[in-house]
Amino acid sequence: MKTGILFTSRNNYDLLDYWLKNVNTEGLFILNIDEDSTPENKIKGKEVCEKHCIAYMDREDRGMQNNITSACNIFKKSNLEWIIWFQHDCFPITNKFFTKFNELVETGKLDNFGSVGFNIKHDGVYQMLSRTPLQQPNRDMWNRFDINTPLPLEYNKVHSVESVSWMCAAVNINQYLKEIIPTGEYQFFHAWDDIAFQFMYKNIHNICIPFLELSHEQIIKKDFNMPVKSPLAKTEEETKKREHYYGKWGHHKVWESRWGFSYDDNSTFEEVKENYSGTLIDKFYNHNLNTGPLQIFEL
């Protein structure tokens, strides 16, 4: 196997234990990086990892991107080439999911891509193929389809995306270490979007593999007394609970300061579009989702 699995955990080890009990990881190496859990949760995390024979480490530097850098350096020593990262409430549903992905890795056909996303069956409602902050039309900032209808033919093929649906995301270790400048400013939210945009700025495609499917089951967090909708916090108590699991907020401001436009309003890209001329970022901004993918790949 040339693929490994990464978890980044913060005070959510009961959910990690549930995931590991219910998923056949097909013999892949698994690393869990703790993101400043409380002392009692660190103890629980070490116990869960030992129970399931997976590696545990405390973070080196804070934030998702720095954790991925740590994982890349560790995985590379074992000659692994790709990392698959999971949110703890996202579960593979394609039979032999990991084997099928690894077979693609071993063909070498993924070598030139940056990040890879999949078809995420979200809360039993949508098939979420990618995140689309720039493409037109921009109503939802997702490329998504009803879960009960077949995907349109053009989107049923491996295709280029702006940013992956990062309930589960894979990253090319060599490309990441070579091309990505990690920041600790994003502790969780928007970290993967920033990675995808860094790749696009270098004209490296991110792709969706729609025939590899997973189920994102947010409701399961209710069984572990976690916020079901992780970004939502309307009261001081809800804000503290969100930070307990995900770290500091403020990722929208970080995004705007780094990229020059608002993630939630692609009209603001007009002011900075000249900075991205000749890049995939510019190509996606001028692309309409309704015409099909920007580019299709045969794997």
Predicted regions and their residues:
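Short, well-formed alpha-helical segments that are part of the catalytic scaffolds
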Residues: 11-25
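A conserved acidic beta->alpha catalytic loop
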Residues: 32-45
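Short beta-strand-to-loop acidic/aromatic patch adjacent to the donor-nucleotide binding site
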Residues: 80-91
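Conserved donor-nucleotide/metal-binding helix-loop-beta segment in metal-dependent transferases, i.e.
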Residues: 96-114
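A recurrent flexible, glycine/aromatic-enriched loop bordering the glycosyltransferase active site
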Residues: 149-171
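Donor nucleotide-sugar recognition loop
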Residues: 163-166, 178-201, 205-215
